[in-house]
C-alpha cells in the first residue's frame, strides 16, 4: 500500500451549469473584439479573473501551442477544457491538503512517524506497523524524520505500489 492508493484522486466529471456560465462569461469578457478566441494576453487576464494568479510563460505557452493555428488563440471549447483541468487540479490539491491537515493533529506543519501510526490506526487498523513504517520512510524524502506537506503531496501524486 502506498499513499496514492489511499483514495485521494482528482474528481473528473461534470461541471455545474452555473460554473460553466461563469467561465463562458469570463471568456466573453476577455474576448473584447468578439473574435471567438482568446489571445495569449486575453488568456492570461481570464486566468487571473478565475484563479487569482497570472499564468507563467510556460503555462501560457503550453496552452497557446494547442491553440488553433488559424486563429492564433484559444477557442471557447479549448478554454473550458483548460479551466476544467485547472479546477480539478485545484480540488485535488485541496483534498491532499485536507488529508495532510487531518494527519497533522498537532498543527506543526509536518508529520512524524507517530502521526502516521495514529492516522493509519484509525483508517486501516489491521495494517501491519512495518507497512506504516515503510510508507512513512518512502514519504520522508530527505529522511529527516518529518514529512512536510511538499513530501506528502509528492507521495500522494507520485507514489508507486510495491
Swiss-Prot record:
Gene Ontology CC entries for this record: cytoplasm
Keywords for the protein's UniProt record, in alphabetical order: Calcium, Metal-binding, Repeat
A GO BP annotation: microtubule cytoskeleton organization
Residue ranges occupied by any EF-hand domain in the UniProt entry: 18-53, 91-126, 127-162
Residues annotated to bind Ca(2+): 140, 142, 144, 146, 151
Gene Ontology molecular function, alphabetical: calcium ion binding; enzyme regulator activity
SUPFAM superfamilies cross-referenced by the UniProt entry: EF-hand
One Pfam match: EF-hand_7
Entries under PANTHER family matching the protein: CALCIUM BINDING PROTEIN (PTHR23050)
Name this polypeptide is given: EF-hand calcium-binding domain-containing protein 11
Amino acid at each position: 500500500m502506498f499513499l496514492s492508493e489511499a483514495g485521494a484522486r482528482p474528481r473528473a466529471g461534470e461541471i455545474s451549469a452555473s460554473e460553466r456560465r461563469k467561465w463562458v462569461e469570463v471568456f466573453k469578457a476577455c474576448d473584447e473584439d468578439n473574435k471567438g478566441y482568446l489571445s495569449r494576453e486575453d488568456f492570461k487576464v481570464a486566468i487571473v479573473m478565475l484563479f487569482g494568479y497570472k499564468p507563467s510563460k510556460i503555462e501560457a505557452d503550453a496552452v497557446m501551442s494547442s491553440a488553433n493555428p488559424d486563429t492564433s488563440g484559444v477557442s471557447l471549447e479549448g478554454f473550458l477544457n483548460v479551466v476544467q483541468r485547472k479546477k480539478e487540479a485545484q480540488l485535488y490539491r485541496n483534498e491532499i491538503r485536507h488529508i495532510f491537515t487531518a494527519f497533522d493533529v498537532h498543527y506543526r506543519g509536518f508529520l512524524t512517524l507517530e502521526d502516521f501510526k495514529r492516522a493509519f490506526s484509525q483508517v486501516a487498523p489491521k495494517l501491519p506497523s512495518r507497512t506504516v513504517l515503510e510508507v512513512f520512510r518512502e514519504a520522508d524524502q530527505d529522511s529527516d524524520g518529518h514529512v512536510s506537506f511538499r513530501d506528502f503531496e509528492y507521495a500522494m501524486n507520485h507514489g508507486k505500489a510495491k
